[in-house]
Amino acid sequence: MSDAGVRLHRWDEIALEKVTEMVSRKFVTGDRETLAQVYLKRGAVVPRHAHASEQMTYVLQGALRMLVDGEDVTVREGEVLRIPTGVAHQVEALDDTFVLGVFSPIRQDWIDRTGE
């Protein structure tokens, strides 16, 4: 590959980061976005929060109950939820759940290890 910023990432070579006892993740970051694999055990709760990134959450396995801007939304396997920049949201795993998340701009707080 050329030296034009092209980079191949292999998920199996990226360390799994334990966020809590119930949530873990792996992520890669480009210039403008972060791509994350997130694993949530059934019953896991990510408290209400907001961030400077637009978020797309694609549920590959399991299901999530999300409270987004006061609205209760269930996101199931095969579904994608878009959360605009700055919108408060909370997550609860209804099952053992595996999601792919895309964030833009990048999650600098994750890189700096200062945010969930």
PLM features: what roles do these ranges have?
Residues G70-T85:
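Short acidic-glycine-tyrosine-enriched beta hairpin
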Residues E21, A36-A50:
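Conserved short histidine dyad/triad with adjacent acidic residue
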Residues L60-Q61, R76-E77, D95:
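A cytosolic small-molecule/anion-sensing beta-strand core signal
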Residues T34, M56, A63-R65, D72, ...:
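Structural motif
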Residues M1-R32, A36, G115-E116:
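A short, N-terminal "cap"/entry segment at the start of jelly-roll beta-barrel domains
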Residues T85-D109:
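Ligand-binding loop in jelly-roll beta-barrel domains
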Residues Y39-K41, H51-M66:
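Short, conserved beta-strand element in jelly-roll/cupin
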